[in-house]
C-alpha cells in the first residue's frame, strides 16, 4: 500500500469515528471545525488521486445522478407491520395471549420498549461492512430502491465501524425529520416562495422520494434503527435489546429512549412516561412499540397473518380527526387582533374533546377555502392549540355558507383595519374596546407577568363589565366591599384576591415590563430590556437607536416600545401603578463575558421558586448559554429546583455539575 493510500485510509477511518461519536453517541470528541478540516483534506487528496477513491468514503454521500424513476427491490425477509393496541386493556390482552401460548413462561416477561417514530420504515443492506442497497418498506414484500438518497443521510454510516463486519447485514429502521430541521426547512421554503410541508412525516417522505439525491442531501433527515433482517456471517446477541446495542457499537444509530421493562406494569409505566415526554422529544412519535426481548421466545411465538405475535404498537390517542364546522366567531385580543375561531361539532382528539379551533386570520380562511358546513381535519399535537389543517371539499354541502370577515369590531363596533404587510386585522378602538381592556388586564395578572393568583379571567370580565376597573392600576384600588358584591365572590375569595394583589406589588422589572403588554415584547425581550437599561426611567427615555442596541430588539420592536412611551395614557397608567405601591429591586446581571454559563449547555429541572422556568431560560440565553431540554454527556450544568427528578438523577450518574437555584442566582448576579 502506498503512502497516499495509507493516508487516505487513515483519514476515512478517523472521519468515520468522528461521525459515529457525533451522530450515534451524541458525544463528539472534536469541534466541528476539526471534522470539516479533515473532510476537506480527504476530498482534496481524492481529487488528486481519483484512482484511490472508494464508494464508502465520507465524501461520497452525494454524487449519484438524478434518477428517472425508482426501481423495485423485493425484500428477502418481508417487512411486516404490527398489530395495534389503543388501551391498557388491549395491551393486557396481548400479554395474556403471549402467556397462554408459551410453554415455559418466564416470570416476569421482559419487554424491549421503544418510541414509535412517525417516519418511514427502510431497509439498509451492508455487504462486508459497506452500504450497498437501501429500500422503502413499500407493501412489506416489495419496496423502492432509495440507495442514493439514504447515502446522503449524515447519521447513516457508509461503512460499518468494525474490523470484522458480517458478510451481509440488513438494518431496519425509521427515517424521520426532527422538529428543528423541519422548521428550518419550511422557513427556507417561505423565504424563497417555495411550497411548505404540512408536517415532518410528509417532509421526510418527500425528501426520501426525491429523484435527485442532491436535494435529499439538503434535507435534515435522521435514521434510528429498530431491528435486523438478514444477518449472515455473524452470531447475533440473543436478545432484541442487546442486538440494538450491538448495532450502536458498529456505528448504527438507535433511539436513546429505548428501555427494558419487566412485566406489564413496567411497560405501561414506560408508555405513560413517553406520552408525557412526547412534546419535548424534538421529533414526532405516535405511540410505543413493545417487543418480547428474548429472541428464542420471539421465535417460539412466531407470526400471525402479516404481524408478529411477540410485538405490538400501543398507539397514542389520535391527533387528527374529522368533524363539521358549525360556525365562525371573531374574537378580539388585547392588542386588537381579530381572530376567527371555528366552532366545531365536538370531537375527541389526542385525549381531549375539541369544540373550538383557531383559523388564525383572513389569509388562512382564504388558503383553506373553507366554508361553514364543511367537513374539516382537526389536528392537536401536545399542548398546541387545536387547528384546522385541511378541508374535504368533496363533502361540501349545498347549503354551505361563506365566511365573511367583519369590517367593524364585533365588541365595540369600531372600524377594523389591516395594515399593509401584516397578516392580522385589528380593531381600532383601543382601550375604548371592552374586549381589548379585558385581554390586556388578563395579560397583566397572568403567571408570567405580575402573577396575581387570586385574580382570574372570570373576575376581570365581571369587573370590566360593571365598569369597576379600566386600567391595571385600578386593580390595586379594589376593596373588600366592592369584591364581595360580585357573583360567586365570597368574603374568603375576596380576601385571597386582595392578598394576591398586595403580594404582587413586589415584582421584578422584567415582569413589570412584560405585564404592560407592549406589542412584540415577550418575556425574553422584557428581560433583555430590564438587564440593559437597569431602570424604568432609562427605558422610558431611550431613543430608537438606544433601544436597538438591546439583544433581539430590531427596528420594528424598537418602534413599538418607543411609541408606547410617547402615549400619555400609557405613562399615566405606569405612574399610577407605581403610586399604588408596585416596586422591584434592582438586580445587576453579570455580562456574558464574565459569567460561568457563556457557551455552556444548561438543563433546568424541578420547580424554581424565585423565578419562573421561562425567566431562567431567557436569562441563561442572554448570558450566552444553550438551554437544553434533556441531560446528555454534552450537558455542562443542571440547575435543580424543588422536586427535581429523572434529569437530576441522570446528571449525577454522568457526574455533571448540579447547581441549586440559590447557587445559580449567586453566579449570575454581582
From Swiss-Prot:
- Domain spans labelled BRCT: 592-670
**What is catalyzed by this enzyme?**
NAD(+) + (deoxyribonucleotide)n-3'-hydroxyl + 5'-phospho-(deoxyribonucleotide)m = (deoxyribonucleotide)n+m + AMP + beta-nicotinamide D-nucleotide
Q: What class of enzyme is it?
A: ligase
Q: Which GO terms describe its biological process?
A: DNA repair; DNA replication
Entries under Pfam families matching the protein: BRCT, DNA_ligase_aden, DNA_ligase_OB, DNA_ligase_ZBD, HHH_2, HHH_5, Nlig-Ia
Keywords in alphabetical order: DNA damage, DNA repair, DNA replication, Ligase, Magnesium, Manganese, Metal-binding, NAD, Zinc
May I ask which residue range the UniProt record assigns to the signal sequence? Answer: none
Task: Report residues binding NAD(+).
Answer: 32-36, 81-82, 114, 137, 174, 291, 315
One GO cellular component, as annotated: cytosol
As cofactor, the record names: Mg(2+); Mn(2+)
Q: Per its UniProt record, what SMART domains does this chain match?
A: BRCT (SM00292), HhH1 (SM00278), LIGANc (SM00532)
Query: What GO molecular functions are on record for this protein?
Result: DNA binding; DNA ligase (NAD+) activity; metal ion binding
Active-site residues, record numbering mapped to chain = 116
Function comment? DNA ligase that catalyzes the formation of phosphodiester linkages between 5'-phosphoryl and 3'-hydroxyl groups in double-stranded DNA using NAD as a coenzyme and as the energy source for the reaction. It is essential for DNA replication and repair of damaged DNA.
Which family, according to UniProt? Belongs to the NAD-dependent DNA ligase family. LigA subfamily.
Report what the protein is called.
DNA ligase
The organism of origin for this protein: Haemophilus influenzae (strain 86-028NP)
Amino acid at each position: 500500500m502506498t503512502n497516499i493510500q495509507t493516508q487516505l485510509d487513515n483519514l476515512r477511518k478517523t472521519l468515520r469515528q468522528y461521525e459515529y461519536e457525533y451522530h450515534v453517541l451524541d458525544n463528539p470528541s472534536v469541534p466541528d471545525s476539526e471534522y470539516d478540516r479533515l473532510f476537506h483534506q480527504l476530498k482534496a487528496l481524492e481529487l488528486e488521486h481519483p484512482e484511490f477513491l472508494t464508494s464508502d468514503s465520507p465524501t461520497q454521500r452525494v454524487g449519484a445522478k438524478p434518477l428517472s424513476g425508482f426501481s423495485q427491490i423485493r425484500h428477502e425477509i418481508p417487512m411486516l407491520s404490527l398489530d395495534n393496541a389503543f388501551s391498557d386493556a388491549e395491551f393486557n390482552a396481548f400479554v395474556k395471549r403471549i402467556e397462554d401460548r408459551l410453554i415455559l413462561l418466564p416470570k416476569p416477561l421482559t419487554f424491549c420498549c421503544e418510541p414509535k417514530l412517525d417516519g418511514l420504515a427502510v431497509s439498509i443492506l451492508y455487504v462486508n461492512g459497506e452500504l450497498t442497497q437501501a429500500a422503502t418498506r413499500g407493501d412489506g414484500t416489495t419496496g423502492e430502491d432509495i440507495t442514493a438518497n439514504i447515502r446522503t443521510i449524515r447519521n447513516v454510516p457508509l461503512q460499518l465501524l468494525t474490523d470484522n463486519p458480517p458478510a451481509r447485514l440488513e438494518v431496519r429502521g425509521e427515517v424521520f425529520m426532527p422538529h428543528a430541521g423541519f422548521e428550518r426547512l419550511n422557513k427556507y421554503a417561505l423565504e424563497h416562495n417555495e411550497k411548505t410541508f404540512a408536517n415532518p412525516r410528509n417532509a421526510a417522505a418527500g425528501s426520501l422520494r426525491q429523484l435527485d439525491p442532491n436535494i435529499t442531501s439538503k434535507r435534515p433527515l435522521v435514521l434510528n434503527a429498530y431491528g435486523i433482517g438478514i444477518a449472515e456471517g455473524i452470531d447475533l446477541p440473543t436478545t432484541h435489546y442487546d442486538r440494538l446495542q450491538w448495532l450502536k457499537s458498529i456505528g448504527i444509530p438507535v433511539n436513546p429512549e429505548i428501555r427494558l421493562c419487566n412485566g406489564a406494569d413496567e411497560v405501561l409505566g414506560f408508555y405513560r412516561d413517553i406520552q408525557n415526554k412526547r412534546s419535548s422529544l424534538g421529533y414526532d412519535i405516535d405511540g410505543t412499540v413493545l417487543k418480547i426481548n428474548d429472541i428464542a421466545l420471539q421465535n417460539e411465538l412466531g407470526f400471525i397473518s402479516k404481524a408478529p405475535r411477540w410485538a405490538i404498537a400501543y398507539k397514542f390517542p389520535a391527533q387528527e380527526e374529522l368533524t363539521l364546522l358549525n360556525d365562525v366567531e371573531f374574537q378580539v385580543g388585547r392588542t386588537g387582533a381579530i381572530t376567527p375561531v371555528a366552532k366545531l361539532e365536538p370531537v375527541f382528539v389526542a385525549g381531549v374533546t375539541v369544540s373550538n379551533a383557531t383559523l388564525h386570520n383572513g389569509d388562512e380562511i382564504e388558503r383553506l377555502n373553507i366554508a361553514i358546513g364543511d367537513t374539516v381535519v382537526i389536528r392537536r399535537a401536545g399542548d398546541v392549540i387545536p387547528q384546522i389543517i385541511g378541508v374535504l371539499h368533496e363533502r361540501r354541502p349545498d347549503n354551505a355558507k361563506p365566511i365573511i370577515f367583519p369590517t367593524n369590531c364585533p365588541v365595540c363596533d369600531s372600524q377594523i383595519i389591516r395594515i399593509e404587510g401584516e397578516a392580522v386585522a385589528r380593531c381600532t378602538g383601543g382601550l375604548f374596546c371592552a374586549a381589548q381592556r379585558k385581554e390586556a388586564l388578563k395579560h397583566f395578572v397572568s403567571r408570567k407577568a405580575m402573577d396575581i393568583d387570586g385574580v382570574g379571567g372570570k373576575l376581570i370580565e365581571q369587573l370590566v363589565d360593571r365598569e369597576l376597573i379600566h386600567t391595571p392600576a385600578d386593580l390595586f384600588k379594589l376593596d373588600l366591599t366592592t369584591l364581595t358584591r360580585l357573583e360567586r365572590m365570597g368574603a374568603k375569595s375576596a380576601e385571597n384576591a386582595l392578598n394576591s394583589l398586595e403580594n404582587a406589588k413586589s415584582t421584578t422589572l422584567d415582569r413589570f415590563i412584560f405585564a404592560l403588554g407592549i406589542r412584540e415584547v415577550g418575556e425574553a425581550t422584557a428581560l433583555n430590556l430590564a438587564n440593559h437599561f437597569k431602570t424604568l426611567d432609562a427605558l422610558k427615555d431611550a431613543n430608537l437607536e438606544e433601544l436597538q442596541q438591546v439583544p433581539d430588539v430590531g427596528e420594528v420592536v424598537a418602534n413599538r416600545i418607543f411609541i408606547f412611551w410617547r402615549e400619555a395614557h400609557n405613562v399615566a397608567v405606569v405612574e399610577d401603578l407605581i403610586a399604588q405601591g408596585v416596586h422591584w429591586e434592582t438586580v445587576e446581571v453579570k455580562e456574558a463575558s464574565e459569567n460561568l454559563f457563556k457557551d455552556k449547555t444548561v438543563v433546568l429541572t424541578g420547580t424554581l421558586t424565585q423565578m419562573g422556568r421561562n425567566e431562567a431560560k431567557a436569562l441563561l440565553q442572554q448570558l450566552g448559554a444553550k438551554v437544553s431540554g434533556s441531560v446528555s454527556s454534552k450537558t455542562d450544568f443542571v440547575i435543580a429546583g424543588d422536586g427535581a427528578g429523572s434529569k437530576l438523577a441522570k446528571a449525577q450518574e454522568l457526574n455533571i455539575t448540579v447547581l441549586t437555584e440559590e447557587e445559580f442566582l449567586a453566579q449570575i448576579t454581582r
